[in-house]
């Protein structure tokens, strides 16, 4: 089941933000994340805030149903307009995630996007993305999305091998994600991503190479590759504990990452974040870069997180409770956190060190600067950028990114 919400102070019922959060807003990009919390089935490795029809039965009634969801989410978009006041910014990015957004009719996703356009306006070059499961779209659906303003789509491929997909409880067949890329291109999508997962129990190096070859052969301009993390409370964790499938160790994850980086570099893809590769700067995911670079975004939907001007908040998780709050004219926010200058400095290091241009050494405290010199000597930071005043991870540093970050912020 979904993980717990963080601790924090209560969110005001009207969703209002302190004045300092809105000061200078015009100088920061603004994005929207729209969460669609519905899935046809729950994948065994997933602990995201998503719900199947069975899980929702009797827990929220009509308010929790996906049939009314677009209208409910649009209510939060209108709340965002009230909270942000006369904020002049046009929205730079919109990302619809889940869950499985494409379980909703394409017309619902288009209406949600239209609400943002009506309330805020969209930048002329706005990036508009939706996630999609390969089995939940067809050419007509993709054409409707493209005609409605979406210009980027991200397909959950995960693997090209049937036995790996089976362990992950994915329901699409091998070959379907690659066909989806062709269908998306035919519909006019400018940018297409494929998500891959490595380190699934039972996956071999050859399986992983085959998945990479299939993904690259489809011709997306962006590929994300993530190590499988086995979260407590998931079906996969229970299967591993019972000895039904083996646990993959960190050395295997490292080997698979090295394979991915080498194969993608040969194919003309460059890393720009530890888990993300693109064929060009234009192919990068601008929405994720808003997160990584500490910009402003409003997260709408159950369990969605937001950040504006150093204030971070999160919504109630259950779709029924979320819809009930908005129906009563209340913010669905469950809590918030006011970030101090030190919080923001540390968070910037945590996020930006994972990027290809790293972080300025001037951000580091004395202890972190000393740690950076050791990381440089150990081959974890690149010497050229370091001499120019930036901490940038080497390939070996990317393998140990979490440890390097911890050392630099301590």
Name these PLM-found stretches.
Residues 15-30, 50-83, 89-365:
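C-terminal scaffold of the Radical SAM
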Residues 1-33, 40:
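Flexible, acidic/Gly-rich N-terminal and inter-domain linker regions that tether
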Residues 377-388:
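A short, conserved structural fragment
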Residues 365-379:
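Short amphipathic alpha-helical interaction segments
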Residues 395-410:
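Short, amphipathic alpha-helical interaction segments positioned at domain boundaries
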Residues 34, 286-287, 388:
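Short loop/turn microsegments at loop-to-beta-strand junctions
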Residues 35-50:
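Local cysteine-cluster metal-coordination motifs and their immediate loop/turn environment
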Residues 388-394:
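Minor-groove-contacting beta-hairpin "wing" of winged helix-turn-helix DNA-binding domains
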């Amino acid at each position: 089941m979904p993980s717990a919400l963080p601790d924090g102070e209560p969110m005001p019922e009207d969703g209002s933000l302190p004045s300092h959060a809105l000061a200078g807003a015009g100088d920061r990009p603004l994005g929207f994340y729209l969460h669609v919390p519905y899935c046809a089935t729950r994948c065994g490795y997933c602990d995201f805030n998503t719900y199947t029809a069975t899980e929702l039965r009797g827990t929220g009634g009509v308010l929790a149903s996906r049939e009314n969801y677009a209208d409910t989410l649009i209510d939060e978009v209108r709340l965002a307009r009230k909270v942000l006041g006369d904020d002049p910014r046009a929205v730079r990015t919109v990302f619809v995630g889940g869950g499985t957004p494409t379980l909703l009719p394409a017309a619902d996703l288009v209406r949600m996007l239209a609400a943002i356009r009506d309330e805020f306006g969209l930048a002329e070059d706005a990036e508009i993305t939706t996630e999609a499961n390969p089995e939940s779209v067809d050419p007509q659906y993709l054409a409707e999305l493209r005609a409605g303003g979406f210009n980027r789509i991200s397909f959950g491929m995960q693997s090209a091998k049937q036995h790996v997909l089976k362990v992950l409880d994915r329901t699409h067949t091998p070959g379907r994600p690659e066909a989806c890329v062709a269908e998306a291109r035919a519909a006019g999508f400018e940018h297409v991503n494929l998500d891959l997962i490595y380190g699934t129990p039972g996956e071999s190096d050859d399986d992983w190479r085959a998945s990479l070859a299939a993904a690259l052969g489809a011709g997306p301009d962006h590929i994300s590759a993530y190590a499988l993390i086995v979260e407590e409370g998931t079906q996969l964790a229970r299967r591993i504990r019972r000895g039904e499938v083996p646990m993959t160790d960190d050395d295997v994850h490292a080997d698979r990452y090295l394979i991915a980086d080498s194969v993608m570099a040969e194919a003309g893809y460059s890393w720009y974040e530890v888990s993300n590769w693109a064929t060009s700067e234009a192919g990068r995911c601008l929405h994720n870069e808003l997160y990584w670079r500490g910009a402003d975004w409003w997260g709408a939907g159950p369990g969605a997180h937001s950040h504006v001007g150093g204030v971070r908040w999160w919504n109630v998780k259950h779709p029924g409770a979320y819809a009930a709050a908005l129906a009563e004219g209340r913010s669905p926010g469950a809590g918030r956190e006011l970030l101090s200058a030190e919080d923001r400095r540390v968070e910037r290091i945590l996020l930006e060190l994972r990027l290809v241009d790293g972080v300025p050494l001037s951000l580091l405290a004395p202890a972190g600067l000393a740690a950076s010199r050791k990381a440089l000597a150990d081959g974890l930071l690149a010497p050229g950028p370091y001499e120019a005043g930036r901490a940038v991870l080497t390939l070996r540093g990317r393998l140990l990114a979490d440890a390097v970050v911890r050392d630099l912020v301590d």
